Amino acid sequence: MFSQLSTNFYPTILQPQTVHRGTAPPNALPAERAPCLIGRPVHFAHGPFAGRTIRASLDEIQAAQLGRKYARVDRRPLDPPPAVRLRLFNVYNAGTEQQTEEEFEEYGDTLGLGFVCTLDLFPLPEGSSCHRSPGPYAEPPVHRVGGCAIYESEKATNALVGSTFVQPTCVTFEGRSTLVFVFSDLAVKYEGEFLLRYRVFDLFSLPRGHRDIAIQAECYGAAFRIYTTKDFPGLPPSTALTKELARVGVRLSVRDTGKKATTKRRKRSDSFDEDDSS
């Protein structure tokens, strides 16, 4: 089992040249020149998967549905807590017509050592901005939601509050052990509709021909809404997955029944919102 680490920890150790330069070959490429490996089979030169070709995938198994706009005094995390599953595949004869892959049979705490998931926040376009005409040098979209394009330049990750880098927890999901990244304390500073992009990398593994740690997989989550305190509809009962995560040690609030905001709580929180905006 792994505890979630603070966001302040990772910017220090995510200096791939510092971590790996002693073992990287002299002709290895730095991150800005190396090919993108997201979602592709990766042959590892160093680390626990050295000599093997591995493909990683992420999928969101629990999406946030709603949240209250962050205030310094009254921070309420997204609900339910967003969670993504990591799947790993051994790849054989990569890059040939005989390429095949086989998912790992066992997932456990030891296998999860070194894996870290991080995320980014994107606002959903509203109204006419959803159908804007691209300019002659327009950037390509990174994702689409209901016909609306999402662009990297619109990323609003600095509006997130909480742990944006987490390590995996091993839980039973769909009848088998699974490595799950849980973002249990995220809040958003602004109201509106948003989605999350999840990305995973392995701190202890270095791809062949690379100097830097590589992002191995990514996925985009479902849209969710952030409400003002006045408009917040309340919290539904906790999901079965949330209860299972809490049972195995992830720090989460569990509710057997829904929780609606009372008038008294709304009035008190409104003053917090005003304090936060000052």
Swiss-Prot record:
Database matches in InterPro entries: Velvet, Velvet_dom, Velvet_dom_sf
Domain of life: Eukaryota
Entry annotated with the keyword DNA-binding: no
A Pfam cross-reference name: Velvet
Subcellular location: Nucleus
PROSITE patterns xrefs: VELVET
Key words, A-Z: Nucleus, Sporulation, Transcription, Transcription regulation
GO biological process terms held by the UniProt record: sporulation resulting in formation of a cellular spore
Principal place of residence: nucleus
TM region positions: none
Region (Disordered): 257-278
Cellular component, GO, one term: nucleus
Keyword Nucleus among record annotations: yes
UniProt record similarity statement: Belongs to the velvet family.
Role, per record: Velvet-domain-containing protein that probably acts as a positive regulator of sexual development.
Name the UniProt record assigns to this protein: Probable velvet family sexual development regulator SCHCODRAFT_28806
